[in-house]
Amino acid sequence: GEVMRKLLYTVALFVIASACSTKSESKPYNWEDDLYQRLLTDFCMTESQVKDYIRKYIPDVTDEQMRQWEASKALECMMLDGEKRYFRNAGPNLFRVDSTCYDIKIAKEGTSPSGSEKVNMENLPEIISAVKKEGKAIVAPKRMRVTYTLTVDTNAVPAGKIIRCWLPYPRQDQARQQDVKFISASEPQYTFSSPECRHSTLYMEKRAVEGEPTVFSETFEFTANGEWHNLKPEDVQPYDTTTALYKEYTAEREKHIVFSPRLRELAAKLTAGETNPYLKAKRIFRWVNDNFPWASAREYSTIENIPEYVLDNRHGDCGQVSLLFITLCRISGIPAHFQSGFMMHPRASVSYTHLRA
């Protein structure tokens, strides 16, 4: 999961590409040129650099091993300008994706839960217990105060140019988050997006100053709740397949939610003999969860079809495996859609992608 990072990365990449270009500003936009620059940015490592990382755990790594990992797609690389270039996180990903390499790294460094995992070990049982006790799905409120800051590097944008900035802001039409309170923004003039917009944002703009970074920030509060639906198979009622809502969320949506013959066959295999939508979704979820380890992802726009990419490469980040799950659910007649937002933990937050089926 990395949606907000990808958004900021895309903006930064566009700024860098524009600033570094020596061609006429009047040249029309060309996706192929843009794609090429994005690939160069993502695939920026040489073989010797990747080997240096691998040697931290496998000191005697061989060329033969490198070729084997490349063939298995555990080590991600591609040819650009006639040169083999490796994904910027190819080394770390190898030790997440390849089971033997994973075991070697764990043997050397051990395992310890992250800060968010430690919080979840306490918070998730609290939510489940509260749902069972109170008999409702939304429980355990926590008041959050958030300061979000975005900094554009010094001279990344020519002095005098206006920088337009959209920062995330809590939606107010979601039952699990309430009492949103705006406190402050870095600029005297700002605009909130309409409640009808798909994304909730606060918009500001500022003129770039030579020799100085451009800083945008906002502060707000809201109450976040835990949410858990203790579903049973018998709770699921037949779908009304005639509604616009059902049709929208069981339809193909190019270019990533495509019902290819390969995915249709896979969905049929995973759900064979099952008629209950909840149990179908559970089968699909368990298969995706058990077979595709998390790995840092290249930019989504450079991938032709993300679910097929996940199948081919046998790994994905949270958004990529979500798209595989969504596509398999929709093929199976189960409504599903993509969502993104923030995991909020004490003194930290993480941009994250998830889904709803």
Language-model features, listed with the residues they occupy:
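Short, Lys/Arg-enriched N-terminal segments with co-localized hydrophobic residues
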Residues: 1-3
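Sec-dependent signal peptide recognition
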Residues: 5-10
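C-terminal motif of bacterial Sec signal peptides marking the signal peptidase cleavage site
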Residues: 18-19
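Intrinsically disordered, low-complexity N-terminal segments that are enriched in acidic
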Residues: 32-229
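Cysteine-centered nucleophilic/redox motifs
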Residues: 165, 284, 313-343
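Acidic low-complexity segments
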Residues: 194-312
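Beta-rich nucleic-acid/ligand-interaction surfaces
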Residues: 343-351
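Conserved small/polar residues in nucleotide/adenosyl-binding loops
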Residues: 353-357
